[in-house]
C-alpha cells in the first residue's frame, strides 16, 4: 500500500486514513517516516452497548495524517467567543436596591475576531445505522471538512476504499476531482448511482 501511496502522492499532498484501536497503532507503525499527527473524530453517537458492562462505550475514531512535506493546509475556522479586552478594568455601578445596597459589574470588554483555529477533535455526528448505505460510511460533512482542509478547488482526491462513494459526493460538493476504487462490484454500483455516473 505505502509503495503506491508514496508513488502517487504529490509532495504537498496529505494521506488521511481512518482507523480504530489496535489497527490505528499498526497503521502508524507501518510508516512512521511519513506519520505526522492524528485527528479524533467524535462521532457523537456511541457504539459497543453489548460490552457496556466490560468497557466504555465508544464514540470516536482516529484519523492518521501522513505526508512527505508540509501539505496544503487550509484551517477550517470555527466560531467562538470574542477575546477579552486589555487595559484597565472599569467597574460600573449598575443597580441599587434597599436590601443589598449597590451592585457593581465589569462591562463586557470582549472584542475582536470570533474565529478560532481548529483543534484535533472533529465533532461530526455519525449516521445512524438505519441511514447508512455502507457499514463504514462516514458523514459527508466530515469528509468535506478534510477535503477543504488539505486540498484546494480543482485538486484531485483519491479514495482507494471508496465504499458507497461518500468521498466522491464530498468532492463534488467542494469542487474537487475524484478518483475512487472499490473491489466489491455491488458496492461499486451503489457508488456510481450516488455519483450519477
Where are these regions (language model features)?
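Short, conserved SAM-binding/catalytic segment
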Residues: 192-197
Amino acid at each position: 500500500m505505502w509503495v503506491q501511496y508514496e508513488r502517487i502522492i504529490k509532495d504537498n499532498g496529505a494521506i488521511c486514513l481512518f482507523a480504530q484501536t489496535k489497527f490505528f497503532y499498526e497503521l502508524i507503525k507501518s510508516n512512521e517516516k511519513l506519520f505526522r499527527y492524528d485527528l479524533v473524530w467524535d462521532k457523537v453517537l456511541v457504539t459497543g452497548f453489548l460490552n457496556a458492562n466490560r468497557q466504555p462505550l465508544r464514540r470516536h475514531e482516529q484519523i492518521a495524517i501522513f505526508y512527505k512535506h508540509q501539505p496544503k493546509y487550509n484551517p477550517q475556522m470555527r466560531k467562538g467567543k470574542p477575546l477579552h479586552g486589555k487595559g484597565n478594568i472599569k467597574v460600573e455601578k449598575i443597580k441599587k436596591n434597599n436590601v443589598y445596597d449597590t451592585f457593581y459589574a465589569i462591562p463586557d470588554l470582549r472584542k475582536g475576531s470570533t474565529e478560532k483555529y481548529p483543534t484535533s477533535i472533529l465533532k461530526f455526528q455519525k449516521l445512524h445505522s438505519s441511514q447508512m448505505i455502507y457499514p463504514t460510511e462516514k458523514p459527508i460533512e466530515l469528509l468535506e471538512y478534510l477535503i477543504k482542509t488539505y486540498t484546494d478547488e480543482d485538486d484531485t482526491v483519491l479514495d482507494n476504499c471508496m465504499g458507497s462513494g461518500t468521498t466522491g459526493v464530498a468532492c463534488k460538493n467542494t469542487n474537487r476531482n475524484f478518483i475512487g476504487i472499490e473491489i466489491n462490484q455491488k458496492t461499486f454500483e451503489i457508488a456510481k448511482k450516488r455519483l450519477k455516473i
